[in-house]
Amino acid sequence: AKEAYNTGDVDYRAVLTKIKESGNFDCLYIAAGYYKQIGLIANQARELGITQPLLATEGAMSGGLIEIAGDNVNGIIFNVACVTEAPGIDELLEKFIARWGYDPSVDVAPDCYMACDAFKLLTGAIEKAGSTDPVAIRDALEATENLQGLTCSITFDPATHNVYRQVPIYQIVDGEFKQIELYDLHA
């Protein structure tokens, strides 16, 4: 079954009931953006008796999800756009919390980490280009090989212009985030 909902919805029972009544699904993929939606959907799915495994987007990578949904998200599997356990991340979190008084791991940590990588990538390309000329920067970006970022080593694929990287797959096990696989996008 494939069902949709509107941004801002908080009651997903009608959609979930249609899915449940279809009886034709092995898992429930929650394509919601943030942990609050994922938590509400998980709670309501379990309330309606949906017992199939839950899959979600990277918005699930938040302690807030466990606070909202508790045992209802035990076993949920989701990908995150970047590695969230790497040297330097703890130091970044400490500095961020000291500066802003807020722990980004609650809801935006992967975006914060990738922003650090993007900044390092851009400043490195400007240095390598020796110029702020957009064409020179573009050429330097495309020539990037093995630049060690916060989350991964960055190398661009010359054919697709995508970054070679690995994507971690997580599962919530007994209220804890556990990395269960590191998927290589270019294997």
Regions picked out by a protein language model, each given a short descriptive name:
Residues A42-C116, E127, F177-L185:
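Extracellular/periplasmic periplasmic-binding protein-like sensory domains
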Residues K2-A4, I76-F78, I169:
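Conserved beta-strand scaffold positions in the cores of enzyme catalytic domains, especially
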Residues K20-G23, E47-G49, I68-N72, S131-D133, ...:
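Extracellular/periplasmic catalytic domains that process cell-envelope and extracellular macromolecules
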Residues T7, L185-A187:
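A short acidic/small-residue loop/turn micro-motif
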Residues D11-A14, K18, K36, L40, ...:
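Extracytoplasmic/secreted proteins, especially bacterial periplasmic and envelope-associated proteins
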Residues A1-G49, T84-E91:
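Extracellular/periplasmic Venus flytrap/periplasmic-binding protein
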Residues R99-C112, T123-F177:
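Segments of small-molecule ligand-sensing domains
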Residues K20-G23, Y29-A32, A45-G49, V80, ...:
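Sec/Tat-exported extracytoplasmic proteins
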